[in-house]
From Swiss-Prot:
Positions of region (Fusion domain-2): 352-637
Matches recorded under SUPFAM superfamilies: Influenza hemagglutinin (stalk), SGNH hydrolase, Viral protein domain
Gene Ontology CC entries for this record: host cell plasma membrane; membrane; viral envelope; virion membrane
Extracellular compartment spans: 1-616
Entry-linked Gene3D superfamilies: 2.20.70.20, 3.90.20.10
Protein name, as recorded: Hemagglutinin-esterase-fusion glycoprotein
Keyword field contains Cell inner membrane: no
Gene responsible for this protein: HE
Active site: S57 (nucleophile), D352 (charge relay system), H355 (charge relay system)
Region (Fusion domain-1): 1-26
Quaternary data: Homotrimer of disulfide-linked HEF1-HEF2.
Organism: Influenza C virus (strain C/Nara/1982)
Keywords: Disulfide bond, Fusion of virus membrane with host endosomal membrane, Fusion of virus membrane with host membrane, Glycoprotein, Hemagglutinin, Host cell membrane, Host membrane, Host-virus interaction, Hydrolase, Membrane, Transmembrane, Transmembrane helix, Viral attachment to host cell, Viral envelope protein, Viral penetration into host cytoplasm, Virion, Virus entry into host cell
Catalytic reactions of this protein: N-acetyl-9-O-acetylneuraminate + H2O = N-acetylneuraminate + acetate + H(+); N-acetyl-4-O-acetylneuraminate + H2O = N-acetylneuraminate + acetate + H(+)
Subcellular location: Virion membrane; Host cell membrane
Length: 641
C-alpha cells in the first residue's frame, strides 16, 4: 500500500509570533537581549597592569602586623607605594619627627589611600594650629595633576642659592626645629647698628627631570608669614613684611607683599604661616623677602603631564578616640575626574582601632579585579550595556546606560518555527517593532563598525543558502545609515544651542551629560530593536532553508524507496518499506528531530572614550548565528494514504 508522508510545521497556543525583517518566527520562549546590571560599591580598575596606588600603613606590606593591619589584599598591596606613618603631605613639608617617604611611581589610573597621618590628631604646629585648609588645597592639586600625568614623584632636594647673611632657623612651636619644606632662614642682627638687616634674595631651580622621572610641571608650596598689623612685624622699625616668588621673567608667581597688600587687621601679636599650592614649570625662580626671615621652597612634587587617567581617592580617617579631618573627601569631590570611596560606618579595625576595617576591605576588594566600567556609583564588570540607575560621574571605561527593563527588546528562544514575513525594506511590518522610527529621538553620537552590522549578520546569499539576499540587506542598511546621518545632524544643532548655557552655567554641563546619556540609551535600544528584527528574519530564512536541506537528506536516504512528489512530501510503499525502514528514512534512527537548536550568540560591545567629560559614543555591534549544524525541531511527520 502506498502512503503519503509529509513534513509539517506544527504551532499551537504556546507559541508566540516574532516579526522580523526578512522573515518571522514562532517561538515557545523569549528572552531579553540584555539584563540590567547593578554596580558594585567601592573601587576597581580598568586594567591591572596600568594602575598604581599611594598609601600608608593600611596598604603597607612591611608593617609587622600585615595583613591584619591592611585594608587591602596582598595582591593589591603589591601595587601600592606605601610606608607606615607616611602621607604625601608629610613628605611635602617634612615636619620634625614625622615619617618622610619618597613617594613616586607611574600608572594611568592612580589610587590614593593616605592622608590620615596629617590630621588634627597629629597636632602639628609650626606657626599654624590648623592645617586642614592647606591639606585640602594640597590634596586637590595632587589629584588634579595626577589625573593628567602617567608618572609623579616627590622631589626632595631642590637646587638653591641662599644669601650669605641667612642661616637655618628653628622655632619653639615646631619642636625647636622646623619644616624641611619650606626651610626657615633667619638673619642675626645687632641693634642699633644693624637693627633690620638686609633684604633676602635667594634662588631655587625646579628640574626637568628627577632621577628617571620627567618633570613638566611641579607642585610647589609658596609659604609666607601673615602678620595682623604692621606694628607686629615692624617692632624694630623695619618697614613692611614681604615674601615673594618671581619667575625668570620677573613675574610674581607666589607669596605675599604687605607693601601693597593690607594686613589682616586682627588683634593677634604672633604671626601664622600660610602655604599656597602653586603649579610651576621647570626653571630658575627667585625669592625676595624682607629682612630677618626667609621661607625657602626646598621640595616639590613633579608630574610628567603625559597621560590623562582616572583618579580614585579613598576616605582616610581614624577609628574612635582620634580626631580626623575630611580634607581628602572635599578635595576629591571638588576635582573633576576624581572618584571618592567613602565609608558608611565609623572606622573599626581588626588589628587595632585604626587598622583592618572590614567595610573598607569590602570597598577596596574590587582593586583585585578588572572592571569594564568604574564610576562614582561603583564598578561594573558585566557586559550588559544597561543598568537600572544612572551611574554618577566621573566614570571611565565602557559604562552601561540607564534603561527600564521593559524597554529592552526580546528575542525568540526555545523551540523555533519559521514562517514567511516582511522584507528588510518594509518599514512597517505586520507587528510593529521597536526599530528605526524610535531612533530619531534626542542626541546621539554613534558609529557603526566599518563592515556594518550586516557584515556580521547577513552577508550575501550563497548556493548553499543562509541569510537574506544581498540586495535586500544593502537597502536595509542604507536606510539605517541615512537615519544615523539625520541623528548626527540633529546632534550638532542641539549642541550648538547648548553652548551658551554651558559658558554661563556649570550646572548646565551636568544637565547636558545626563541628557546625552538618556539619548544614548534611547538610541541604543532603538539599534537593538533593529538587530532583533534582523536576527529574527535571518533565523527564519535560515530555518526554512534548513527544512529544504532536511528534505534533501530524506530523499537521499530513501533512495528508490520513496518518491518526492512535492517539496517536503514523499510517496512510499509500506509493503516494501516497513516501519523500521520508515524510521530510518524519516527519523534518522530516533536521532532527529532534536528538541533544541544551537543558542544565539548576540553581543553588543559598547565603546566610549576613556574620559567621561566630552566623550563620544561608538557603538560596535556584532551579532552572529550558527546555522551550519542546525537541525530543525518542531516538525511532525504527517502520513496519509
Amino acid at each position: 500500500e502506498k502512503i503519503k508522508i509529509c513534513l509539517q510545521k506544527q504551532v499551537n497556543s504556546s507559541f508566540s509570533l516574532h516579526n522580523g525583517f526578512g522573515g518571522n518566527l514562532y517561538a515557545t520562549e523569549e528572552k531579553r537581549m540584555f539584563e540590567l546590571v547593578k554596580p558594585k560599591a567601592g573601587a576597581s580598575v580598568l586594567n591591572q597592569s596600568t594602575w598604581i596606588g599611594f598609601g600608608d600603613s593600611r596598604t603597607d606590606k612591611s608593617n609587622p602586623n600585615f595583613p591584619r593591619s591592611a585594608d587591602v589584599s596582598v595582591k593589591t598591596a603589591n601595587k601600592f607605594r606605601s610606608l607606615t606613618g607616611g602621607s604625601l603631605m608629610l613628605s611635602m613639608f617634612g615636619p620634625p619627627g614625622k615619617v618622610d617617604y619618597l613617594y613616586q611611581g607611574c600608572g594611568k589610573h592612580k589610587v590614593f589611600y593616605e592622608g590620615v597621618n596629617w590630621s588634627p590628631h597629629a597636632a602639628i604646629d609650626c606657626y599654624r594650629k590648623n592645617w586642614t585648609d592647606i591639606k585640602l588645597n594640597f590634596q586637590k592639586n595632587i589629584y588634579e595633576l595626577a589625573s593628567q600625568s602617567h608618572c609623579m614623584s616627590l622631589v626632595n632636594a631642590l637646587d638653591k642659592t641662599i644669601p650669605l647673611q641667612a642661616t637655618a632657623g628653628v622655632a619653639g612651636n615646631c619642636n625647636n626645629s622646623f619644616l624641611k619644606n619650606p626651610a626657615l632662614y633667619t638673619q642675626e642682627v645687632t641693634p642699633p647698628x644693624x637693627k633690620c638687616g638686609k633684604e633676602n634674595l635667594a634662588f631655587f631651580t625646579l628640574p626637568t627631570q628627577f632621577g628617571t622621572y620627567e618633570c613638566r610641571l611641579h607642585l610647589v608650596a609658596s609659604c609666607y608669614f601673615i602678620y595682623d598689623s604692621k606694628e607686629v612685624y615692624n617692632k624694630r622699625g623695619c618697614d613692611n613684611y614681604f615674601q615673594v616668588i618671581y619667575d625668570s621673567s620677573g613675574k610674581v608667581v607666589g607669596g605675599l607683599d604687605n607693601r601693597v597688600s593690607p594686613y589682616t587687621g586682627n588683634s593677634g601679636d604672633t604671626p601664622t604661616m600660610q602655604c599656597d599650592m602653586i603649579q610651576l614649570k621647570p626653571g630658575r625662580y627667585s625669592v625676595r623677602s624682607s629682612p630677618r626671615f626667609l621661607l625657602m621652597p626646598e621640595r616639590s612634587y613633579c608630574f610628567d603631564m603625559k597621560e590623562k587617567g582616572p583618579v580614585t581617592a579613598v576616605q582616610s580617617i581614624w577609628g574612635k578616640d582620634r580626631k580626623s579631618d575630611y580634607a581628602v573627601d572635599q578635595a576629591c569631590l571638588s576635582t573633576p575626574g576624581c572618584m571618592l570611596i567613602q565609608k558608611q560606618k565609623p572606622y573599626t579595625g581588626e588589628a587595632d582601632d585604626h587598622h583592618g576595617d572590614q567595610e573598607m576591605r569590602e570597598l577596596l576588594s574590587g582593586l583585585d579585579y578588572e572592571a569594564r566600567c568604574i564610576s562614582q556609583s561603583g564598578w561594573v564588570n558585566e557586559t550588559s550595556p544597561f543598568t537600572e540607575e544612572y551611574l554618577l560621574p566621573p566614570k571611565f571605561g565602557r559604562c552601561p546606560l540607564a534603561a527600564k527593563e521593559e524597554s529592552i527588546p526580546k528575542i525568540p528562544d526555545g523551540l523555533l518555527i519559521p514562517t514567511s514575513g516582511t522584507d528588510t525594506t518594509v518599514t512597517k511590518p505586520k507587528s510593529r517593532i521597536f526599530g528605526i522610527d524610535d531612533l530619531i529621538i534626542g542626541l546621539l553620537f554613534v558609529a557603526i563598525v566599518e563592515a556594518g552590522i550586516g557584515g556580521y549578520l547577513l552577508g550575501s546569499r550563497k548556493e548553499s543558502g543562509g541569510g537574506v539576499t544581498k540586495e535586500s540587506a544593502e537597502k536595509g542598511f542604507e536606510k539605517i545609515g541615512n537615519d544615523i546621518q539625520i541623528l548626527r545632524s540633529s546632534t550638532n544643532i542641539a549642541i550648538e544651542k547648548l553652548n551658551d548655557r554651558i559658558s554661563h552655567d556649570e550646572q548646565a554641563i551636568r544637565d547636558l551629560t545626563l541628557e546625552i546619556e538618556n539619548a544614548r540609551s534611547e538610541a541604543l535600544l532603538g539599534e537593538l530593536g533593529i538587530i532583533r528584527a534582523l536576527l529574527v528574519g535571518n533565523i527564519s530564512i535560515g530555518l526554512q532553508e534548513s527544512l529544504w536541506e532536511l528534505a534533501s537528506e530524506i530523499t537521499n536516504r530513501a533512495g528508490d524507496l520513496a518518491v518526492e512528489i512535492s517539496p517536503g512530501c514523499w510517496i512510499i510503499d509500506n509493503n516494501i518499506c516497513d516501519q523500521s525502514c520508515q524510521n530510518f528514512i524519516f527519523k534518522f534512527n530516533e536521532t532527529a528531530p532534536v528538541p533544541t537548536i544551537p543558542p544565539l550568540d548576540t553581543k553588543i560591545d559598547l565603546q566610549s572614550d576613556p574620559f567621561y567629560w566630552g566623550s563620544s559614543l561608538g557603538l560596535a555591534i556584532t551579532a552572529a548565528i550558527s546555522l551550519a549544524a542546525l537541525v530543525i525541531s518542531g516538525i511532525a511527520i504527517c502520513r496519509t494514504k
